[in-house]
Amino acid sequence: MIINEELQNVRLSQILKDALIKATDTYSTPPQIIWIDNSTIATLGNFSASTGKAKAKKTFNVSALVAASLANGQVLNYHASLPEGKRRILYVDTEQSRYHCHNVLERILKLAGLSTATDNENLDFICLREYTPAVRIEVIDYALSHNEGYGLVIIDGIRDLLLDINNAAESVEVINKMMEWSSKYNIHIHCVLHLNKGDNNVRGHIGTEMNNKAETVLVISKNSNTPNISEVKALHIREKEFKPFAFTVNEQGLPELATDYDSSEDEHGKSAPLKYTDLTIE
C-alpha cells in the first residue's frame, strides 16, 4: 500500500513538474499549416473540426483539405504548407467500407495531382469500421507513437470513438484525447462531426467541449437555392473570419469551386445562427 502511494506521488510530482510554466520559459509560435484565404484554420499542436448535416458533402470537403496538405499547395480555397519532417498525413475512417474508403483515397490523390497507380509515402489511410471504440483509440494511439513525421491527422468520424454519444464523460475523454495527441506529437487533428437536424436528441456535451477547445469549426451546408452547391463557412475560428466559399462535384466525382457562387445570395433563406448545442458527434 505504501509502495503504491509512493508511486502515485512520484507520478503526480512529475505531472506537476511538466505542467509548470515559468516566466523564464520561451515558447515559439505554433506553426501555421492550413489557411482559407488569409485566415489560419489549422496550426500544429491543435485540433479542429468540420460539421454539417447528412449529404452536405463533408467528406468531399475534407478530401480537398487533405489534398492541399498532401500537395503543400492549394485545392478549392484551402492552402497548406506542412513543414519538413511533418509532411505525413494519417487519415482514419471509422464508418465506411474499404471500397468507399478507397474511393476517398483516390479522390485525394487526384485532387493533389498525384498518381493513383502508386502508393504515396506521405499518406496513410486506415479503415477501422469493424472495430470497437476502445480498439480504434488504441490503434490511433499506436500509429502516432510508432510512426514519425505525421503533421496532419483526420478522424472521420469521431462519434465511433465512443460507446454512448449521449455520455458527457465519454465526450470529455475523447476531446481530451484530441488535445493529448495534438500536443504530445505536435500534430494537427481534424475531426468530422454531424449537425443536429433540429430535434433535442444528443445535444450539448460534445458541442460544449468543441466550443471550449477547438481551434476552428467549419460548417458545410447545402445552398438553399442550389442544392448541388455546398457552402463552407466558419462556425468558430480563433483567427479572423474568412469569406464563405462554395463547391460542386464535377462529372469526375471531384469537388471544384462554384465560380458563380455569391455568399450574399442565400441571406434571405438563412436560418438562425448555429450554436454548439446543435452539434453531435459523427
Regions found by a protein language model. Give the residues of each.
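Conserved inter-motif catalytic segment of the P-loop NTP-binding fold
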Residues: 83-166, 253, 261-266
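Alpha-helical scaffold elements adjacent to nucleotide-binding pockets in ATP/GTP-utilizing enzyme cores
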Residues: 64-65, 100-108, 139, 143, ...
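Conserved, well-folded catalytic cores of nucleic-acid-processing
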Residues: 68-73, 108-111, 161-164, 181, ...
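The Walker A/P-loop phosphate-binding site
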Residues: 4-108
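Phosphate-binding/switch region of NTP-binding enzymes
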Residues: 49-51, 55, 60, 169-261
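Amphipathic alpha-helical transducer elements in NTP-driven molecular machines
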Residues: 44, 98, 102, 133-137, ...
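DNA transaction DNA-binding modules
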Residues: 256-282
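Conserved catalytic network of the ASCE P-loop NTPase/AAA+ motor domain
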Residues: 42, 81-85, 115-118, 145-147, ...
